Amino acid sequence: MNHLATSKEDILAASRELIRENGWAAVSIRAVASRCSVSTGTIYNYYGSKADLLGDTIESIWREIFFQPEDEQVFKDVVACISWIYKRLEYGNKQFPGFFSLHSFVFMKDEKTDGKKKMLQTWEHIQNGLCDILKNDPKIRSDVFDQQFTERQFADILFSFILVSMIRQDYDPSSVYHVWNDGSSVRQWRCIPPDSSCNRTLYNRS
């Protein structure tokens, strides 16, 4: 038995390893204590319940998946950002098999609202990032978005495609690229009846 103090980082690392090896069902206070070679009481010093432990574990997995990229240009170009997101999702699926499955989402929802809350916070962070990039990508035409069709609305559309890909474990971003490259068709969905303002491409044309 390891009688030395165990840090929260060690506990979360052990939890991630258990999920990586055997999925969500493998995580329990007792299993994590055994992996850390400490008593269950040591784990309870940090987490009052399994649900609390899972909540922080979920957050730590999302952080590992969406670790800050070395190339900051990723956040200045929509296509580059989408490509990076899909690559990180593929990494996450390899490191934590089944993490993105529909079963896992239901599990997190049923287990404790804290896990669901932290998952939704991550999703909101991605959506906000897409929105910011849509506002700042210099290649996007300045007249594409307006009060009727905002950057936020298009970011939500892009994210919905990403979310479906995540659940299906399909890490080919081509469908999102298609929506992005043919952004005028997305605008037409919102124009009833269609008018000339719908006929816009997203990019500046030289």
Give the positions of each predicted feature:
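N-terminal intrinsically disordered/low-complexity leader segments
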Residues: M1-T6, D143-F145, C191, D195-S206
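Helix-turn-helix
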Residues: L4, D10, A14, L18-D52, ...
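Short, charged helix-capping/linker segments at alpha-helix termini
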Residues: A25-A26, S142-F149
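Hydrophobic alpha-helical connector segments
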Residues: D56, E70-Q95, E151-A155
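Helix-loop "lid/cap" segments that line or gate small-molecule binding pockets
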Residues: Y86-K94, L102-D110, I133-K135, M166, ...
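Short alpha-helical scaffolding segments that buttress acidic/His motifs in well-ordered protein cores
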Residues: L89, H103, L158-I162, N199
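Amphipathic alpha-helical packing segments from all-alpha helical-bundle domains
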Residues: K94-G98, E111-I140, F149-R152, D156
